[in-house]
Curated annotation (Swiss-Prot):
Residue spans crossing the bilayer: 6-26, 38-58, 65-85, 92-112
Keywords: Cell membrane, Membrane, Transmembrane, Transmembrane helix
Protein name: UPF0344 protein BA_1155/GBAA_1155/BAS1072
Entry's family note: Belongs to the UPF0344 family.
Membrane topology category: Multi-pass membrane protein
A cellular component term, taken from the record's GO annotations: plasma membrane
Taxonomic lineage from the root: Bacteria, Bacillati, Bacillota, Bacilli, Bacillales
Presence of the UniProt keyword DNA damage in the record: no
Record-linked Pfam families: DUF1516
Keyword Cell membrane: yes
Subcellular locations according to the entry: Cell membrane
Length: 121
């Protein structure tokens, strides 16, 4: 399940930047955007399944950290969607980019810090 979740995230980020480049070039990116929305569903479902599996074995305060990681992951997905929707409507995206980047850094940090991830920190 972990590999499916990581693959879905990788494809989601690739599709996000492809859709962003299409919208910024003035072309229609609806098809790529819809594919990205499908990836959102896969990311959320696999992430929730991982979360529920972890909750069966997690001890002490790990419940809180994995819950925060899940919330940050949902914020990343929300940030991605808001950036693309605002781009398609030709509105300013500065604040939404900030949300996206802060949440993405938080997700990567927690993913590397928590016991299931790589032990970098």
């Amino acid at each position: 399940m972990v590999h499916m979740h990581i693959t879905a995230w990788a494809l989601g980020l690739i599709l996000f930047f492809v859709a962003y480049s299409l919208y910024s070039a003035g072309r229609k990116g609806k098809g790529v955007h819809m594919g990205l929305r499908l990836m959102y569903i896969i990311i959320i479902v696999t992430g929730f399944m991982l979360y529920m599996g972890i909750m069966k074995t997690a001890t002490s305060n790990m419940h809180m950290w994995y819950g925060l990681k899940m919330i940050a992951g949902i914020l990343v997905i929300g940030g991605m969607e808001m950036v693309l929707v605002k781009m398609s409507k030709n509105k300013a995206t500065g604040a939404v980019w900030g949300l996206f980047i802060v949440a993405l850094v938080a997700v990567f940090y927690l993913g590397l810090k928590l016991p299931i991830g790589w032990q970098v920190f």
